[in-house]
Amino acid sequence: LTSEFRHDLDAMQREINDRTRLVVVTNPNNPSGTVVPRADLEQFVASMPDHVTVVVDEAYMDYVKEPAYKGMGDVAVSRPNVLVTRTFSKIYGLPGLRVGYALAVPETLKNFWMYTSFPSSIAIHAATAALEDMDHVAATRQMTWEGRDYLYYELNAMGLSYVRTESNFMLIEVGDAEGITRKLARQNVYVRNADRIWKVGNHIRVSIGTREENQFFITALRQAFA
């Protein structure tokens, strides 16, 4: 990641060699929640040698509020070296069913076919129903946006640094990430130690929940620093 917690596409490009076959870009990024601008991604894809496929994971795209953000689905269905993946596990609320889909040209999909597994009939019916419930998607998106703003306000009041996010989670700089994680757990608040898991020093990753959950988290975080 760059100093702004975005994918360092230049650094990724420098690591590509004759043995490279697959490059994955998660956009929005996990764990930072930041997004790579569409123009930068298009340039990155165009720079790839023919033997490299770029997989763009758009699992969190439905949480993005940035007006300039645009998914890469249209690029994937027109270029043989791009595959876009999306999921029903996030904003659609179906994480246990493990159902998602990919966008690519037919030849690329054929090459990846052997690595796929078929979802159950229950998962298919649930995903179909989820696609028909756009009210849920809109409500969840709005709740997440309001939750972000609330957390930004409270974290600013506490004097804590954080990464502005376009997803349903965010990174917060807390100093002793392991210590704060343990103190929060004692209050039944469970966050991810981003320092230990993703090597993002001194940060925790917290999911953005309902207003009540966010308030509970802020109260616990204040207590952890007391």
What are these model-derived regions, one by one?
Residues 104, 172-175, 208-210:
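Short beta-strand-to-loop capping motifs
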Residues 22-28, 54-58, 163-165:
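Short beta-strands and strand-loop turn motifs
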